[in-house]
Amino acid sequence: MEKLILGLDPGLAVLGFGLIKCIYNSKTEKIDSTSLVDFGVIKTTKKQEMGQRLVTIYEDLHTILNNFKPDLAATEKLFFYRMGNTILVAQARGILILALAQNEIPLIEFTPAQIKQAVTGYGNADKYDVQQAVARELNLEEIPKPDDAADALAVALTASWLN
């Protein structure tokens, strides 16, 4: 069985996405192979009005969903850490939840510690350790750039293992 998993790292200025394909053994339901399909970012600028920034995120994400038709999406749970930044991330997150719901794509969420633990084996791993693990798991010669895309791939890998 084949499954396309979309990992998302929400942000208003930069929203990272990473898409992986997992092939599961039909008898054991364990993963036989995982491969990179695509990754990148959706960017907006402070010069754009808020509504236009959200429209950009929605339209670009909608294009990704239509082009790839993922079976599952995953993202990091939103935690309150800085009021202004949390509100901006929450707005972008609302747009991605809407786009996924409209396309009937299930969404699962993980804490940062769950993602770090799944990808590196250590819940307090730093960003570089996570990025190296992503490159290793997907047989990439280099760490995916930018960081937001690498983070999204870490979320997708976590979903493939924990879902």
From Swiss-Prot:
Binds 2 Mg(2+) ion per subunit. It catalyses: Endonucleolytic cleavage at a junction such as a reciprocal single-stranded crossover between two homologous DNA duplexes (Holliday junction). InterPro entries: RNaseH-like_sf, RNaseH_sf, X-over_junc_endoDNase_RuvC. The active site is at 9, 76, 148. Pfam families: RuvC. Keywords: Cytoplasm, DNA damage, DNA recombination, DNA repair, DNA-binding, Endonuclease, Hydrolase, Magnesium, Metal-binding, Nuclease. The keyword Transcription regulation does not apply. It is found in: Cytoplasm. Mg(2+) 1 binds at residues 9, 148. Its main location: cytoplasm. Its cofactor is Mg(2+). GO terms for cellular component: cytoplasm; Holliday junction resolvase complex. GO terms for biological process: DNA recombination; DNA repair. Its EC number is 3.1.21.10. CDD domains: RuvC. One of its GO terms (molecular function) is magnesium ion binding. The keyword Nucleus does not apply. Mg(2+) 2 binds at residue 76. It comes from the Bacteria. The RuvA-RuvB-RuvC complex processes Holliday junction (HJ) DNA during genetic recombination and DNA repair. Endonuclease that resolves HJ intermediates. Cleaves cruciform DNA by making single-stranded nicks across the HJ at symmetrical positions within the homologous arms, yielding a 5'-phosphate and a 3'-hydroxyl group; requires a central core of homology in the junction. The consensus cleavage sequence is 5'-(A/T)TT(C/G)-3'. Cleavage occurs on the 3'-side of the TT dinucleotide at the point of strand exchange. PANTHER family: CROSSOVER JUNCTION ENDODEOXYRIBONUCLEASE RUVC (PTHR30194:SF3). Homodimer which binds Holliday junction (HJ) DNA. The HJ becomes 2-fold symmetrical on binding to RuvC with unstacked arms; it has a different conformation from HJ DNA in complex with RuvA. In the full resolvosome a probable DNA-RuvA(4)-RuvB(12)-RuvC(2) complex forms which resolves the HJ. Belongs to the RuvC family. This is Crossover junction endodeoxyribonuclease RuvC. It comes from Trichodesmium erythraeum (strain IMS101).
